[in-house]
Amino acid sequence: MGETNSRLSPFLTLISERPVFIILAMSAGADREGQFRRMRETAREIFQQALAEASIDRAFAQHVHCEHGVLRVREDLYDLQAYSNAFVISIGKAGHTMVQALTEQLGSSLEGIVATSVERSTQVRGFRYFRGGHPTPNAESIQAASAMLKALEAQTESSLVIFLLSGGGSSIVEKPIDDEISLDDLVATYSVLVHSGAPIAEINTIRKHLSSVKGGRLARRAFPAQQVSLLVSDVPDDTPDALASGPTMPDTTTVEDCYRIAEKYELPRQLPPSTRELFERHALEETPKSDDPVFHRSRWWLLLSNQTAVEQAQAAAEAAGFVVRVDNSCDDWDYERAAEYLLTRLRDLKKEFGRVCLISGGEVTVKVTNGGMGGRNQQFALACATKISGESVTVLSAGTDGIDGNSPAAGALADGMTLERARVRGLEAGIALERFDAYPFFQALGDAIETGPTGNNLRDLRILMAY
């Protein structure tokens, strides 16, 4: 009997240890899944903190003050008693939020016009509101432009005009330069531009020269009033005149740039006849430049930009214990190229530092060929998901305005378990990527970033973490 037990003991030991092995394996899997979940939560927290710290209310409280009838905007002082009146024009996705912040500093006696793309349940007293279209103009976009042009024409040399500009203004306020261009043709033209694959700066170059309000033409209508523009920017810091297509700033682009861009992306053959004719006849008119007298009484101040959001995300990631690096070099790159570049950079940084966070600002481009539901941030995140399966990597890409493409989301999260979790639910990342249909994919996983419209617009943030 003792001999039998001796012979069986290895098998008994093996049998008794096997459940331990299974339990340990399951425990390791659960720990790894828990780590991915915690990192997704951390990425969300970093993004949310960046939004909170780069808010419009904070920027106005820091840079705009009024005391004893004197308005201070950064380094400028304006004695309000020296002007016959002050009139405010607010344009863009942050139009309402900026007016609210301004009235908190100056009081409720202001009046003006607000054009934004978000429907408001409340409005600031004294202001006329328009809900313009985005990413393409609508009837109210044209009505807003007409109302602004008429109001600015009534301003005098003793008037102070305060312009509040934010992203999205290019379509939210619009009036074609040629009356022969109908709203339908204008919408068709915008659609061609948005889906051309061109970066926003090139799109805005053409928008300026097709518009009665862009490229400094709104400032021309306000002349000779004193003008000051406050900017919440969704364009690169070195091209401020691209914000809302620069309605109050000297235009650094030319009609020759327009013709070159149109040829580069083969635009004329895609445009409706009324706008195509302007390109074919080279009939576009030049916009006002920096030496134009209309800008002699104009000032411009940047209050917030993508760099602000990047810096706040960096601070939040450092507080979370990451070594942080910032790389904005892929701004305006194709999303696939940007994903490959940033992931390669992240892997290199991980070898050097271990727990590392790579933050990238700006925007990637997507040339849409199939009409699914999503946007550039979700498309970028999905592309990353297909490249990081099994890796201890988490990627968040989202827009600071809370809106990504034609979806309800601001962006999405992806990590080394995304494809595995998707397969369990019968989701195919490759099909969603090909169809530009990323939102249903991420929404089903619970990894869509849904903030709702934030009232701000500082371009996009990409947060990549390796651990």
Annotated model-derived regions:
Residues 382-467:
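Internal helix-turn-beta structural module
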Residues 115-157, 206-207:
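Glycine-rich oxoanion-binding loops at beta->alpha junctions
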Residues 180-197, 251-266, 370-396:
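Gly/Ser/Thr-rich active-site loops/lids in small-molecule metabolic enzymes
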Residues 101-110, 126-129, 176-188, 220-224, ...:
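A glycine- and small-aliphatic-rich helix-loop capping segment at beta-alpha/alpha-beta transitions
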